[in-house]
Amino acid sequence: MARPDKAAAVAELADQFRSSNAAVLTEYRGLTVAQLKTLRRSLGEDAQYAVVKNTLTKIAANEAGINTLDDLFNGPTAVAFITGDPVVSAKGLRDFAKDNPNLVIKGGVLDGKALSADEIKKLADLESREVLLAKLAGAFKGKQSQAASLFQALPSKFVRTAEALRAKKAEQGGAE
């Protein structure tokens, strides 16, 4: 690869690191082209999976301010650049690696923080952002319903108590 081509490749990779909220490094040794195509589809629309040259990618990551990945650039390396929900792509990688042991998750970075392979697998065990937001909204809605019931119960209980007192006084007044 000519020097200007290398500089362009480094610039493009650095842009991908900057525009991604997560990147996962994998070793793909032994995977066929068809398997790589299946892997790319399993990552979702918001992820791009690229086979990369270690030296160029290491330089690009450092240019993008990510210097925690240096130890992971050995052997055949591919990077999943994730711009959307990292949980969805992490699930895709984990599930694909279960079915295809030739794919090895090396580690990655999420919002500038280095992640080990185990941390990426734990990330994959989380529910997606949308599901977590829906659960949170459901919890708030349930609490609001309980509060509304409580606020409705207080005045009606007060009215029933006042009515019982009035009836008791009327009964006591009529008995005398």
UniProtKB/Swiss-Prot annotation:
Q: Which GO terms describe its biological process?
A: translation
Q: Cite the entry's keywords alphabetically.
A: Ribonucleoprotein, Ribosomal protein, RNA-binding, rRNA-binding
**CDD domains linked:** Ribosomal_L10
Pfam families (alphabetical): Ribosomal_L10 (PF00466)
InterPro entries in the record: Ribosomal_uL10 (IPR001790), Ribosomal_uL10-like_sf (IPR043141), Ribosomal_uL10_bac (IPR022973), Ribosomal_uL10_bac_type (IPR047865), Ribosomal_uL10_CS_bac (IPR002363)
Q: Name one GO molecular function term.
A: structural constituent of ribosome
Xref: HAMAP family: Ribosomal_uL10
| Quaternary organization | Part of the ribosomal stalk of the 50S ribosomal subunit. The N-terminus interacts with L11 and the large rRNA to form the base of the stalk. The C-terminus forms an elongated spine to which L12 dimers bind in a sequential fashion forming a multimeric L10(L12)X complex.
Give the protein name, as stated in the record: Large ribosomal subunit protein uL10
